[in-house]
Structure formats: structure tokens, C-alpha cells
Amino acid sequence: MTFLKRVKEYVGDAFRAAKYIGQGMGVVFDHMGRRPVTVQYPFEKLIPSERFRGRIHFEFDKCIACEICVRVCPIDLPVVDWAYNPELKKKELYSYSIDFGVCIFCANCVEFCPTNCLSVTEDYELATYDRHDLNYHQVAMGRLPSKVTEDPMVTPLREFAYLPKGVIDPHDLPAGSQRAGKRPEEILAEMRAAKAAKEAEAKAAKAAAE
């Protein structure tokens, strides 16, 4: 009886082992047909999506020190240093800073800013060796980042950032797959074509009137 029990356990263990090996090989075979997804950073970079919220850009001259950004921030992050100027009868901004080591990039400050002095950029390269370097003041926040598409030293990887509508897996896509919506260069081309057509219509109308 003990012998038969041991044989039964052995056969059961063998079937379980075969099942687990089959599951593992299924994962292996599934990945064998996929395209490589390794990004050779920093020589290859992803193009951020249309609504990507990266580093916040700040324009010092537009800020009126209303501190709305501080009130709408979930963690009261922006530090606004100002003083009232009795001669001008308004606030005078001295400094403005945001610690991106704490920021959650919700962009509430951008949405509620009455003067549009804050805006989100496509800059996501904020890594540093010292967390104190992530505390950006108005000068650092005033710098505009360079675009990935305009950097000759970088290969922009469009296919991993822009997928067709309804597709969430970047693998096994046809070579000519396009993302949902239009790319920036396509939008610019349409705007230029519309402008040229409008100018042509205006010239034709002017010529007809003469």
C-alpha cells in the first residue's frame, strides 16, 4: 500500500512539473515572436504622448504672486516669496520654486494659473545624485527643454509612445501602424496648407473685386 501511494505521489509530481514547464515554455514562445523592446538610452528616447505631464515651466514676468497654485496644490508645494509694493500697490515677486522630488505632477497649478505663467513640458530627465538638486527655482524652471525630435544625437522612438486606437500592446504591429490622432508634424502641415488656401482665396477675392 505504501508502494502504490509513493507511485501515485510520484506520478502526480511528474504531471505538475510537466504542467509548470509547459506554462513557462508558453511564455518563452510568446516572447519569441515579439519585436525587441530594449531602449538604448540615452541614444534612444521615447517621444512623450500628447498629454504627458513633465517638468513645469515657469515665466517670471507673468507671475502676479496670487498664490493660487499653492492653494490648489494637493501638497502645498510651490514656494512663492513676495512682498507688497506700496508705490505700485501690488505684490512684487521675489522668488518662485518647486521641489520636483516631492511634486506629483498633477498639473493643478498649470490648470488654475490665471496668467498662464506655468506650463507643462515634455522634459522627463530630472534624475540627479542629490535630492536637493530637484528643488528648482525660477531660473531653472524658466529654461525650456530641447525636443527629442530635434536632437541629432538621439533616435526618437515613436512606435513605443504612439499606438493605434484601441491597442495597448506595442508588439506584433504592422510596419505602417499609425497612432490614434495626428503627429505634430502632420498637424503643422495641415495648418500650413489651410493658411496657404486661405491666402489664395483672399487673393482671388481681391482680384475678382478689382
From Swiss-Prot:
What compartments host this protein? Cellular thylakoid membrane
Asked whether the UniProt record includes Metal-binding among its keywords, one would answer yes
Q: Which organism is it from?
A: Synechococcus sp. (strain JA-2-3B'a(2-13))
What cellular component GO annotations does this protein have? Answer: plasma membrane-derived thylakoid membrane
Any single biological process term in GO: photosynthesis, light reaction
Q: What is the protein name stated in its UniProt record?
A: NAD(P)H-quinone oxidoreductase subunit I
Indicate the segments annotated as coiled coil, or none if absent: none
Q: What is the lineage of its organism?
A: Bacteria, Bacillati, Cyanobacteriota, Cyanophyceae, Synechococcales
Entry keywords, A to Z: 4Fe-4S, Iron, Iron-sulfur, Membrane, Metal-binding, NAD, NADP, Plastoquinone, Quinone, Repeat, Thylakoid, Translocase
Any idea what job this protein has? NDH-1 shuttles electrons from an unknown electron donor, via FMN and iron-sulfur (Fe-S) centers, to quinones in the respiratory and/or the photosynthetic chain. The immediate electron acceptor for the enzyme in this species is believed to be plastoquinone. Couples the redox reaction to proton translocation, and thus conserves the redox energy in a proton gradient.
Where does the 4Fe-4S ferredoxin-type domain start and stop, copy by copy?
A: 54-83, 94-123
Entry similarity comment:
Belongs to the complex I 23 kDa subunit family.
Main localization, broad class: membrane
A GO MF annotation of the entry reads: quinone binding
| Recorded catalytic activity of this chain's protein | a plastoquinone + NADH + (n+1) H(+)(in) = a plastoquinol + NAD(+) + n H(+)(out); a plastoquinone + NADPH + (n+1) H(+)(in) = a plastoquinol + NADP(+) + n H(+)(out)
Q: What class of enzyme is it?
A: translocase
Q: What is its EC number?
A: 7.1.1.-
**Quaternary structure and partners:** NDH-1 is composed of at least 11 different subunits.
Top-rank taxon, per record: Bacteria
